Amino acid sequence: KLSEEDAAAIPYREGQTVKFLNQVGDTLTYQLVRDEIYPYNGDQYINAINGVDVMHPAPHSTECYARTVILICEEWDAKRLCFTARPEKEFSFHSDDLDLNICLLPNGPYTINGIDYEHVHHEILYSHYTGELLYDWYYNEEFGLLYFKKGDFSLTRIP
Protein backbone atom coordinates (compact mmCIF):
# COMPACT_ATOMS: atom_id res chain seq x y z
CA LYS A 1 0.00 0.00 0.00
CA LEU A 2 1.13 3.55 -0.67
CA SER A 3 1.82 5.35 2.61
CA GLU A 4 0.44 8.82 3.28
CA GLU A 5 4.01 10.11 3.36
CA ASP A 6 4.77 8.66 -0.08
CA ALA A 7 1.50 9.99 -1.53
CA ALA A 8 2.28 13.42 -0.04
CA ALA A 9 5.48 13.63 -2.13
CA ILE A 10 3.16 15.20 -4.71
CA PRO A 11 1.66 18.30 -3.05
CA TYR A 12 -1.02 19.02 -5.66
CA ARG A 13 -4.68 18.47 -4.70
CA GLU A 14 -7.98 18.22 -6.57
CA GLY A 15 -9.19 21.49 -8.06
CA GLN A 16 -5.85 23.21 -7.52
CA THR A 17 -4.28 25.52 -10.08
CA VAL A 18 -0.56 26.23 -10.27
CA LYS A 19 1.00 29.18 -12.08
CA PHE A 20 4.32 29.18 -13.89
CA LEU A 21 6.28 31.63 -16.02
CA ASN A 22 7.33 30.13 -19.34
CA GLN A 23 10.52 30.82 -21.28
CA VAL A 24 9.22 34.11 -22.75
CA GLY A 25 7.76 35.42 -19.49
CA ASP A 26 4.12 34.52 -20.12
CA THR A 27 2.08 33.22 -17.18
CA LEU A 28 0.72 29.70 -17.70
CA THR A 29 -1.98 28.36 -15.41
CA TYR A 30 -2.02 24.59 -14.92
CA GLN A 31 -5.10 22.83 -13.57
CA LEU A 32 -5.05 19.51 -11.77
CA VAL A 33 -7.22 17.22 -13.91
CA ARG A 34 -6.41 13.80 -12.49
CA ASP A 35 -5.42 12.48 -9.06
CA GLU A 36 -5.56 8.74 -8.67
CA ILE A 37 -4.15 6.06 -6.36
CA TYR A 38 -4.18 2.67 -8.03
CA PRO A 39 -2.53 -0.78 -8.04
CA TYR A 40 0.72 -0.22 -9.89
CA ASN A 41 2.59 -2.16 -12.50
CA GLY A 42 4.38 -0.97 -15.63
CA ASP A 43 1.30 -1.13 -17.86
CA GLN A 44 -0.78 0.91 -15.41
CA TYR A 45 1.95 3.55 -15.25
CA ILE A 46 2.05 3.91 -19.04
CA ASN A 47 -1.75 4.21 -19.12
CA ALA A 48 -1.77 6.77 -16.29
CA ILE A 49 0.79 9.13 -17.82
CA ASN A 50 -1.01 8.98 -21.16
CA GLY A 51 -4.32 9.94 -19.57
CA VAL A 52 -5.94 6.55 -20.15
CA ASP A 53 -8.28 5.17 -17.52
CA VAL A 54 -6.24 2.90 -15.31
CA MET A 55 -7.61 -0.62 -15.41
CA HIS A 56 -6.99 -2.56 -12.23
CA PRO A 57 -4.53 -5.38 -12.89
CA ALA A 58 -4.90 -8.97 -11.81
CA PRO A 59 -3.66 -9.39 -8.21
CA HIS A 60 -0.57 -11.32 -9.32
CA SER A 61 0.56 -8.42 -11.54
CA THR A 62 0.27 -5.70 -8.90
CA GLU A 63 3.72 -4.58 -7.81
CA CYS A 64 2.53 -1.93 -5.34
CA TYR A 65 0.25 1.11 -5.23
CA ALA A 66 1.05 4.45 -6.80
CA ARG A 67 -0.40 7.95 -6.96
CA THR A 68 -0.46 9.81 -10.26
CA VAL A 69 -1.36 13.47 -10.64
CA ILE A 70 -1.75 15.18 -14.02
CA LEU A 71 -1.77 18.94 -14.57
CA ILE A 72 -2.63 20.50 -17.92
CA CYS A 73 -2.61 24.00 -19.35
CA GLU A 74 -4.85 25.20 -22.16
CA GLU A 75 -2.04 27.13 -23.87
CA TRP A 76 -1.20 25.57 -27.24
CA ASP A 77 2.53 25.14 -26.56
CA ALA A 78 2.37 24.12 -22.89
CA LYS A 79 3.51 20.67 -21.91
CA ARG A 80 1.36 18.36 -19.82
CA LEU A 81 2.87 17.66 -16.39
CA CYS A 82 2.48 14.23 -14.81
CA PHE A 83 3.84 13.18 -11.42
CA THR A 84 3.81 9.63 -10.03
CA ALA A 85 4.84 8.59 -6.52
CA ARG A 86 5.42 4.97 -5.51
CA PRO A 87 6.49 3.44 -2.17
CA GLU A 88 9.81 4.54 -0.69
CA LYS A 89 9.35 7.89 -2.44
CA GLU A 90 10.29 6.50 -5.81
CA PHE A 91 9.13 9.33 -8.01
CA SER A 92 8.55 9.91 -11.71
CA PHE A 93 8.03 13.13 -13.63
CA HIS A 94 6.68 12.97 -17.16
CA SER A 95 6.20 15.87 -19.52
CA ASP A 96 5.13 14.88 -23.02
CA ASP A 97 8.43 13.67 -24.49
CA LEU A 98 10.36 13.35 -21.21
CA ASP A 99 10.15 10.69 -18.51
CA LEU A 100 12.38 10.96 -15.44
CA ASN A 101 12.67 8.50 -12.57
CA ILE A 102 14.37 9.54 -9.38
CA CYS A 103 14.39 8.84 -5.68
CA LEU A 104 13.17 11.92 -3.91
CA LEU A 105 16.24 12.62 -1.83
CA PRO A 106 16.61 16.36 -1.40
CA ASN A 107 20.10 17.55 -2.15
CA GLY A 108 20.09 21.10 -0.92
CA PRO A 109 18.47 24.47 -0.48
CA TYR A 110 18.11 26.55 -3.65
CA THR A 111 16.90 30.03 -4.56
CA ILE A 112 14.48 29.98 -7.48
CA ASN A 113 12.73 33.06 -8.84
CA GLY A 114 14.02 35.01 -5.81
CA ILE A 115 12.57 32.61 -3.22
CA ASP A 116 14.60 30.33 -0.95
CA TYR A 117 13.41 26.72 -0.81
CA GLU A 118 14.68 24.01 1.55
CA HIS A 119 14.82 20.28 0.82
CA VAL A 120 14.95 20.63 -2.95
CA HIS A 121 15.75 17.83 -5.34
CA HIS A 122 17.72 19.05 -8.35
CA GLU A 123 18.30 16.93 -11.43
CA ILE A 124 20.32 18.07 -14.44
CA LEU A 125 21.54 16.11 -17.45
CA TYR A 126 23.79 17.01 -20.37
CA SER A 127 24.29 15.02 -23.57
CA HIS A 128 27.40 12.84 -23.45
CA TYR A 129 27.87 13.48 -27.17
CA THR A 130 27.27 17.20 -27.63
CA GLY A 131 27.44 18.64 -24.12
CA GLU A 132 24.02 20.19 -24.76
CA LEU A 133 21.64 20.58 -21.81
CA LEU A 134 18.98 17.86 -22.05
CA TYR A 135 16.96 18.88 -18.99
CA ASP A 136 17.21 20.73 -15.71
CA TRP A 137 14.57 20.65 -12.99
CA TYR A 138 14.00 21.45 -9.33
CA TYR A 139 11.31 19.84 -7.18
CA ASN A 140 10.18 20.25 -3.58
CA GLU A 141 7.66 18.05 -1.73
CA GLU A 142 5.97 21.05 -0.14
CA PHE A 143 5.52 23.15 -3.31
CA GLY A 144 5.98 20.69 -6.19
CA LEU A 145 7.72 21.63 -9.42
CA LEU A 146 9.83 24.76 -8.92
CA TYR A 147 11.66 24.95 -12.24
CA PHE A 148 11.85 22.84 -15.39
CA LYS A 149 13.83 23.36 -18.59
CA LYS A 150 14.08 21.16 -21.65
CA GLY A 151 15.25 22.57 -24.95
CA ASP A 152 13.63 25.94 -25.58
CA PHE A 153 10.79 25.23 -23.13
CA SER A 154 10.96 26.24 -19.46
CA LEU A 155 8.64 26.72 -16.52
CA THR A 156 9.36 28.64 -13.31
CA ARG A 157 6.92 28.40 -10.39
CA ILE A 158 5.06 31.58 -9.46
CA PRO A 159 4.31 31.58 -5.70
Features from the language model and the residues they span:
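Conserved functional acidic sites
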Residues: K1-P159
